[in-house]
Amino acid sequence: PVLMIATYGENDKVDVMNMAWGGICDNNMVALNISEGHKTAKNIKERGAFTLSIADIDHLEESDFFGTASGNNMEDKFERTGMHAIKSTRVDAPIIEEYPLTLECRVSELQHESYGFRVLGEIVNVISDEKILDESGKVDPTKLNAFVFDQFQNGYYKISYTIKNFYSINLKIFL
């Protein structure tokens, strides 16, 4: 899904970036592959923390704006969207209230590679809106109203239903 990185800049100014490359890379870790020129990269280096939210269709316009406007050139980028942020009590980063699922993350490693800049973050907490949970209290992906970005067509596509459960598809091959 499309992921939104939220950080604090100078004077606790909220900055949000739409991330194209990255995601969960271990049970309690995320990987962000971003350009070091982004304001978000600078903020992550200075603060050592960020939040990572799943964007939903209800906030597609704002999420797309966060991916096209630069915090380096637009000081009121976050404010223009009308969205709201609260300070995390666990990490030095903002939580965007409108997004239904947010991972609070602490930087564990910064990697400078030939292909770019990678941030590895430890997930220290997960915040989810009750409306996206199933009867057992687990996140129901169909209730997230999430979308993905297709780099071939530059389009956003809704994630809508389960096609098959993991580990149930190829059981015949194992037998």
Model-derived segments and their meaning:
Residues 1-175:
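Basic, polyanion-binding surface patches
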